[in-house]
UniProtKB/Swiss-Prot annotation:
Gene: plsX
A Pfam match: FA_synthesis
Protein localization: Cytoplasm
GO molecular-function term, one example from the UniProt record: phosphate:acyl-[acyl carrier protein] acyltransferase activity
Protein name according to UniProt: Phosphate acyltransferase
C-alpha cells in the first residue's frame, strides 16, 4: 500500500478541489492510502470516499504570502508541516501540496532531508511538447543560483525520473544554453557541459536552445533555478496568450470566423490537449529522502487526481531508492 500525505488546505481552491481529487484517486487506485491534513469539518464537506482515507485535524495553515522558512518554523501545527513530518516519521511514503511553493521546498529540505551526497535538491516538472510526449526540466526555481556540479546532478536525477517514471528509454539529456556549441555559455555552463559529457551513464546530447524546447529536442533539460523558473512562466504565459487570442478572434470575428472556428475545432482541441499541463501532474523536488510533490496553486480536482497518479508512479518506480544507490556509487568514484 502506497501511503500519501496530502495537504488539504494548500492551493487556491482548497480544500474542495483537493478533496474531490482525492475522491477520484481513491476510486481509481486500490493500492493507495491517503492521509488528509487540514480542517476536519471543511474536509468532511467534500469527502465521499470511506476506505483507505484518514483525516488528521490541523489548526493552522500556511498562506501563500507567508515567508517560507519562518512559516514552517512558527506554524508547527500547519497542515503542510504535519503532512511533511508524517513522511519524516515513517507514517507516509510521500507528501503532496498545492500550497506555498517556498514553504514546501523548505519543509522538504529541512524536515524530509536531502539524500546523502546530493548538493542541492532541484524542482522538476514534466512540461508539454507539440508531439504530446513532454520533457522533464529542472531546476524550476528551488535554487536561485547553481554551480556546475548541481547541474550535473540534475542531469542524473532527471534522467532517472524520465526513465523509471515516464518510461523513456535512454532519455536524451540537454543543457539549456544560448547556443548549441560546447563553448557557449558562462563558465558554469561550460563546466557543467564537461561533467555531463564525461558521465557515460547519461545520454547527454549537448547544449539545447530555448526555442527548441517545445519541439522535443530533449527528454530532460537541465538548467539553473532562476532560468528554469523564467522559462516555465514564459511557456505558461505564451500558451495562455495564444489560446486567448484564438478564442477572442473567433468570438469577435463575425459569422465567417465562427464557422471557421467550428471547422478547426477538432484540430485545435487536439493541439491544445497536447499542451495541457493538467495531466502531467505536479513538480517534484528531487534529491530528497522521500518524494515531495508540488501541485499547481490553481489546481482543480482533475489536476489533483493526476498529481496523485504521478506520486503513485514515483513510489512504484522506487526513484528515491535508486537515487540513493546511484549517488553512493557516484561519490565513491569521485573519492
Amino acid at each position: 500500500m502506497k501511503r500519501i500525505a496530502v495537504d488539504a488546505m494548500g492551493g487556491d481552491h482548497a480544500p474542495q478541489a483537493v478533496v474531490e481529487g482525492v475522491n477520484q484517486a481513491l476510486a481509481a487506485f486500490p493500492d493507495i492510502e491517503i492521509q488528509l491534513y487540514g480542517d476536519e469539518a471543511k474536509i468532511k464537506q467534500y469527502l465521499t470516499a470511506t476506505e483507505r482515507v484518514s483525516i488528521v485535524h490541523t489548526t493552522e495553515k500556511i498562506n501563500s504570502d507567508d515567508e517560507p522558512v519562518k512559516a514552517i518554523r512558527r506554524k508547527k501545527e500547519a497542515s503542510m508541516v504535519l503532512a511533511t513530518k508524517a513522511v519524516k516519521d515513517g507514517q507516509a511514503d510521500a507528501v503532496l501540496s498545492a500550497g506555498n511553493t517556498g514553504a514546501l521546498l523548505a519543509a522538504g529540505v529541512f524536515v524530509v532531508g536531502r539524500i546523502k551526497n546530493i548538493d542541492r535538491p532541484g524542482l522538476m516538472s514534466t512540461l508539454p511538447t507539440m508531439d504530446g510526449k513532454g520533457f522533464d526540466m529542472m531546476d524550476l526555481g528551488a535554487n536561485a543560483e547553481n554551480i556546475a556540479h548541481h547541474l550535473y546532478q540534475y542531469g542524473i536525477l532527471g534522467s532517472f525520473y524520465a526513465e523509471h517514471v515516464r518510461g523513456v528509454k535512454q532519455p536524451r539529456v540537454g543543457l539549456l544554453n544560448n547556443g548549441t556549441e560546447d563553448t557557449k555559455g558562462t563558465p558554469v555552463h561550460q563546466e557543467a557541459y564537461k561533467l555531463l559529457a564525461e558521465d557515460k551513464s547519461i545520454n547527454f546530447i549537448g547544449n539545447v536552445e530555448a526555442r527548441e524546447l517545445l519541439n522535443s529536442v530533449a527528454d530532460v533539460v537541465v538548467t539553473d533555478g532562476f532560468t528554469g523558473n523564467a522559462v516555465l512562466k514564459t511557456i505558461e504565459g505564451t500558451a495562455k496568450s495564444i489560446v486567448g487570442q484564438l478564442t477572442g478572434s473567433i468570438k469577435n470575428g463575425g459569422l465567417r470566423a465562427k464557422l471557421g472556428g467550428l471547422l478547426v475545432k477538432p484540430t485545435l482541441k487536439k493541439a491544445l490537449g497536447a499542451m495541457d499541463y493538467k495531466t502531467a501532474g505536479g513538480a517534484v523536488l528531487l534529491g530528497l529522502k522521500a518524494p515531495v510533490i508540488k501541485a499547481h496553486g490553481s489546481s482543480d480536482a482533475q489536476s489533483i487526481f493526476y498529481t496523485i497518479k504521478q506520486t503513485r508512479s514515483i513510489l512504484e518506480a522506487g526513484i528515491v531508492e535508486k537515487s540513493v544507490a546511484k549517488f553512493s556509487v557516484v561519490e565513491e568514484s569521485h573519492d
